[in-house]
């Protein structure tokens, strides 16, 4: 799978268990608002084709470094999008930024692109990396709501979700996310271990 620069851990074991125990993802966003986790490549600037790194192998046909535009990129679109698997890129088919790319481009940079404004390249890559962490936690918190949480934990979960979904992020706030609010959420998620199977942490 692609590797993205600057991402945090987000308690990976708990993430996968919570997602496995909650097959139905609750819809928390208000009906009048677009779902922030919905990926819309038409509103992005091919950030995944720029920021992500991948290694030649089963999922990708060649190596690519972070910050290196993919050689298959044509404008803001992939020149082989309709035949990615056939061309040796099933990893691209499987990848989902969870709406982080389009949110960064539209919300943080007002529709600007690194392709027409090269000076924005690094800032957009960093914002994409951080927004991906924001959206990973939205996905995790939504899944947690389908578990048997006590009322206090349920309320805390909903408050975190509201902060992540409804806030209009700036580049500075995204840069501070992983050392601030993200840690608060991770600590909260870890506290949910009591609703997981008793043997989950065995041999870990």
Residue ranges of predicted features:
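Hydrophobic alpha-helical membrane-insertion segments
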Residues: 4-6
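Short loop/turn segments that flank or connect secondary-structure elements
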Residues: 29-47, 53-204
């Amino acid at each position: 799978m692609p590797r993205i620069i600057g991402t945090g851990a987000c308690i990976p074991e708990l993430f996968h268990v919570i997602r496995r125990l909650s097959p139905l993802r609750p819809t928390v966003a208000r009906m009048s608002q677009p779902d922030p986790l919905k990926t819309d490549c038409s509103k992005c600037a091919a950030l995944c084709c720029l920021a992500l790194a991948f290694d030649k192998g089963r999922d990708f046909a060649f190596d690519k470094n972070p910050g290196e535009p993919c050689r298959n990129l044509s404008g803001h679109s992939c020149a082989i999008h309709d035949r990615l698997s056939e061309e040796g890129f099933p990893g691209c088919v499987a990848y989902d930024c969870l709406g982080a790319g389009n949110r960064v481009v539209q919300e943080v940079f007002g529709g600007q692109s690194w392709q027409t404004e090269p000076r924005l390249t690094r800032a957009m890559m960093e914002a994409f990396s951080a927004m991906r962490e924001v959206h990973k936690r939205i996905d995790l918190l939504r899944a947690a709501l389908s578990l048997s949480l006590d009322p206090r934990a349920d309320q805390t979960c909903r408050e975190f979700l509201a902060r992540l979904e409804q806030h209009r992020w700036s580049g500075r706030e995204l840069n501070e996310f992983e050392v601030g609010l993200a840690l608060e959420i991770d600590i909260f998620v870890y506290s949910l271990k009591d609703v997981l199977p008793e043997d989950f942490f065995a041999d870990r």
